[in-house]
């Protein structure tokens, strides 16, 4: 099921903007201290580097992603999630706005 809203959170009002505006997100902290980001990636092919482990959840649009050591692009659509280990690069390819929640840790 696709997450449609997150209750009882603190939201960073200043956006994090990456890749010349191709990725824009806002940090979210839940009441229990859990951190997430909510954002959008505009059409592009990008390489991200994780710090902590991440779970990417697609809430609208779609993307293709490729994890390290793989040459295979996998598809993520609304309701799908994929995991990336910490301190790891991954590639993402977007042909339409991809709206996501990034779950950290």
UniProtKB/Swiss-Prot annotation:
Keyword terms, alphabetized: Glycosyltransferase, Transferase
Entry GO CC: cytosol
Family: Belongs to the nucleoside phosphorylase PpnP family.
HAMAP family named among the record's database cross-references: Nucleos_phosphorylase_PpnP
A GO MF label: thymidine phosphorylase activity
Job description of the protein: Catalyzes the phosphorolysis of diverse nucleosides, yielding D-ribose 1-phosphate and the respective free bases. Can use uridine, adenosine, guanosine, cytidine, thymidine, inosine and xanthosine as substrates. Also catalyzes the reverse reactions.
SUPFAM superfamilies: RmlC-like cupins
Membrane listed as a keyword: no
Record Gene3D superfamilies: Jelly Rolls
EC code(s) of this entry: 2.4.2.1, 2.4.2.2
Name of protein: Pyrimidine/purine nucleoside phosphorylase
Reactions that this protein is recorded to catalyse: a purine D-ribonucleoside + phosphate = a purine nucleobase + alpha-D-ribose 1-phosphate; adenosine + phosphate = alpha-D-ribose 1-phosphate + adenine; cytidine + phosphate = cytosine + alpha-D-ribose 1-phosphate; guanosine + phosphate = alpha-D-ribose 1-phosphate + guanine
InterPro entries referenced in this protein's UniProt entry, alphabetically: Ppnp (IPR009664), RmlC-like_jellyroll (IPR014710), RmlC_Cupin_sf (IPR011051)
Domain of life: Bacteria
Broadest EC class assigned to this enzyme: transferase
Keyword rRNA processing: no
């Amino acid at each position: 099921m696709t997450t449609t809203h997150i209750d009882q959170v603190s939201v960073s009002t200043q956006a994090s903007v990456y890749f010349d505006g191709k990725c824009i997100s806002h940090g979210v902290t839940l009441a229990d201290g859990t951190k997430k980001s909510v954002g959008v990636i505009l059409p592009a092919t990008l390489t991200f580097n994780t710090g902590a482990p991440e779970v990417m959840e697609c809430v609208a649009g779609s993307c293709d992603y490729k994890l390290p050591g793989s040459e295979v692009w996998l598809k993520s659509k609304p309701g799908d999630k994929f995991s990336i280990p910490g301190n790891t690069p991954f590639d993402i390819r977007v042909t339409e706005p991809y709206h996501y929640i990034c779950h950290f840790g």
